[in-house]
């Protein structure tokens, strides 16, 4: 997919599709299906997208640094907690995937909790999150977090205004407690424009491989865009504390979004290179008395390819 079309909006769509090639599959997509929608949404506002070669070169460099960070976290028994928040379709999942892609899942893990159960709803609000906080030598990334109360729960009416106010009073001290306990806490908000969210939702509607990402809550969030904006602004004003400030990542270009977030994350943690002992691969030992057993054919996966 390297040709140039006469329609700039389709060039942008092609770049979006190529972005998925690094995920080990290609998406068959009907470009005419969305071309009119893209023209209508963007007109002359097509975003300036980062070149793919520049993107991958820098992504690999940053992922190598993330491995160094992982080694440092494990070696120093540090605790890192990264909160990822933002509008629906803002690219949080893509950023998280690029952060964890080459890391050890036993050290760097992702937490994405479902809606609270009836029992959890009766608990102290932060209680369901506490078991997932990092222990020594761990990095934890929250794909949405306790800030659901300030966002979706508030806008959709799942929490009362009294509960929201209690949250705003509690969360600064809760996060100060985490920092005092030795946790390195980073909070990111991923920001996209109204038009960009509309386009990404349309791609989810028309792309069978992305339809699972589209929920009734996503559709409702389009209707309540301004309510979410107001809730976000109050969340920033009430929870942006010196011990745990917010960092906003612009996300209209997903490639820049990923690189900028990872670059910033690395700059906020004082990690160092950890020396490793040289590894020498031992020779295989052969036992002259060993005979390999012949296994029945039904144990093998058929060679279709």
Swiss-Prot record:
Coiled-coil intervals, chain numbering: none
Pfam families membership: PPK2
Activity vs pH: Has two pH optima at 8 and 10.
Highest taxon listed in the record's lineage: Bacteria
MF terms (GO), sorted A to Z: polyphosphate kinase activity
Family that this chain belongs to: Belongs to the polyphosphate kinase 2 (PPK2) family. Class I subfamily.
Name the UniProt record assigns to this protein: NDP-polyphosphate phosphotransferase 1
